[in-house]
């Protein structure tokens, strides 16, 4: 059961669709949304600036000062976006569970070893909602990959457009692997609420056979999920020789 959703907030314009996606997911399971702003100080954000190590000293100083100001601006934006979100959607702010089965929210900010702290929060959550990285938000270039591979938790990537319904149709890309099994298990609460579930697989070396695919579909039936299955053939690369 998904009851806690981590929502990293950048303080930039990407927050809008990330927050909307998190709210839509939260409403499907009355979850608590923990909004986390990772405040990257200049020393941490500087590596995101291309070739900064080759810049002359005075230029680097000005760049670091600019990064500091941008960081403060994003921090203020993250706080503001959170407060506006809770006010507009009437989401109760609280740090501990209440009696009512409703969406609640909390906010925190980390600046000391930000990526380490972000991963720690991610591992202690049931689900993470992330936005696509933009250069202006100071987030690491491989944030999504890092959280996916090192948190051990499922992630949802918010779309660029405002989502209307996050659980209408869910496509499951399946491969016979430990990672796929773990991801499917973590996603079961969402699959159980979806109106349509599609199992997608490709026949290749190490991929599921038809019998394995059918067995997976039967397993989902035990959870009340009547999934459609699409098992295709991977086209051969390259032309005839």
Protein language model annotation of sequence segments:
Residues 4, 42, 49-52, 69-128, ...:
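Structural beta-alpha unit
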Residues 1-64, 150, 164-235:
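Small/aliphatic-rich secondary-structure junction motif
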Residues 18, 111-114, 140-141, 180-183, ...:
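Amphipathic coiled-coil/heptad-repeat helices and related helical stalk/stem segments
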Residues 31, 87, 153:
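A short helix->loop->beta-strand "cap" motif at the edges of active sites that frequently abuts
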Residues 73, 77, 142, 182, ...:
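Conserved active-site and cofactor/substrate-binding residues in soluble primary-metabolism enzymes
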Residues 14-15, 19-24, 28, 107, ...:
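Gly/Ser-rich helix-loop-strand patches that form or flank binding pockets
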């Amino acid at each position: 059961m998904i009851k806690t959703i981590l929502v990293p907030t950048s303080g930039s314009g990407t927050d809008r669709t990330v927050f909307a996606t998190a709210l839509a997911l939260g409403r499907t399971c009355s979850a608590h949304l923990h909004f986390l702003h990772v405040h990257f100080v200049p020393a941490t954000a500087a590596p995101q600036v291309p070739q900064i190590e080759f810049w002359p000293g005075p230029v680097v100083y000005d760049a670091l000062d600019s990064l500091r100001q941008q960081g403060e601006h994003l921090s203020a934006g993250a706080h503001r976006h959170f407060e506006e979100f809770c006010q507009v959607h009437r989401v109760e702010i609280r740090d501990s569970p209440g009696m009512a089965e409703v969406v609640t929210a909390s906010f925190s900010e980390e600046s000391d070893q930000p990526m380490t702290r972000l991963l720690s929060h991610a591992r202690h959550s049931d689900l993470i909602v992330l936005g696509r990285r933009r250069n202006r938000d100071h987030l690491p270039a491989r944030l999504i990959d890092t959280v996916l591979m090192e948190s051990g938790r499922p992630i949802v990537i918010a779309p660029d457009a405002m989502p209307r319904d996050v659980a209408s149709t869910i496509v499951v890309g399946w491969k016979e692997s430990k990672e796929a099994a773990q991801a499917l298990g973590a996603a079961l609460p969402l699959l159980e609420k979806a109106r349509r579930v599609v199992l997608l697989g490709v026949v290749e070396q190490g991929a599921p056979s038809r019998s394995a695919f059918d067995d997976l579909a039967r397993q989902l039936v035990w959870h009340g999920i009547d999934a459609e299955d699409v098992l295709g053939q991977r086209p051969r690369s390259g032309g005839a020789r």
